[in-house]
């Protein structure tokens, strides 16, 4: 079984021990690469942003487990040099995949801004995700945490990543393997990042549905796109 997940530290509890498990090949890569590999069928499952999961034909979502931000995100932000409502050009995180969609949906839904994509030298703002958040950029002095913006708007948790399985993958075995990895990881990992939850309960699912409604209005979902759970 071939499983892919981003290299970000907050993902560690969900893949705890998988690299050492017989019959499992674990690929840690950038979100954009994981999406491509799942679309090509070279992975059986990958941890993806919800909008990316919908870009995989007939993918199924493993319920109950994911990356959830109940409040602030800290690892996902918009850096800007103008007020958010005035952003006309934005530089995306080229490796961030569907995490860029979250920022662009918030700009459109909360601030009425639908900026075009630009290189960083001409941009009014840039989207930073994962490890890139650690870098300061004096050209964009204002930092806006995506989790905080989302929570202020909706009062709901944000589901940042879900386990997406390709069509034809061994679903029962995959659910067992991923569930056991999460149980081990949450029991044995002591340095879990504070803003992150790994359980997709009722409130998180409400947040996920709200986000996909917004993303659909903004044109970020494929036609007829809907998450299908396994």
Language-model regions: role of each:
Residues 1-230:
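Domain-level signature for soluble enzymes in the chorismate/prephenate branch of the shikimate pathway
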């Amino acid at each position: 079984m071939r499983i892919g997940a981003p290299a970000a530290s907050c993902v560690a509890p969900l893949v705890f021990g998988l690299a050492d498990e017989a019959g499992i090949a674990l690929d840690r890569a950038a979100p954009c690469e994981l999406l491509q590999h799942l679309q090509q069928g070279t992975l059986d499952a990958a941890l993806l942003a919800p909008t990316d999961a919908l870009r995989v034909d007939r993918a199924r979502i493993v319920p109950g487990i994911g990356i959830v931000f109940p409040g602030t995100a800290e690892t996902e932000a918009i850096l800007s040099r103008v007020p958010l409502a005035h952003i006309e050009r934005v530089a995306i995180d080229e490796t961030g995949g569907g995490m860029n969609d979250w920022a662009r949906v918030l700009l459109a839904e909360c601030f009425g801004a639908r900026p075009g994509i630009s290189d960083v030298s001409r941009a009014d703002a840039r989207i930073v995700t994962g490890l890139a958040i650690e870098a300061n950029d004096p050209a964009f002095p204002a930092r806006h945490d995506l989790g905080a913006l989302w929570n202020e708007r909706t009062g709901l948790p944000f589901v940042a990543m879900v386990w997406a399985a390709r069509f034809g993958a061994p679903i029962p075995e995959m659910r067992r393997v991923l569930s056991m990895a999460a149980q081990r990881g949450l029991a044995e990992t002591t340095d879990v990042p504070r803003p992150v939850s790994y359980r997709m309960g009722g409130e998180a699912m409400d947040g996920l549905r709200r986000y996909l409604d917004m993303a659909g209005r903004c044109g970020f979902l494929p036609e007829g796109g809907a998450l299908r759970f396994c």
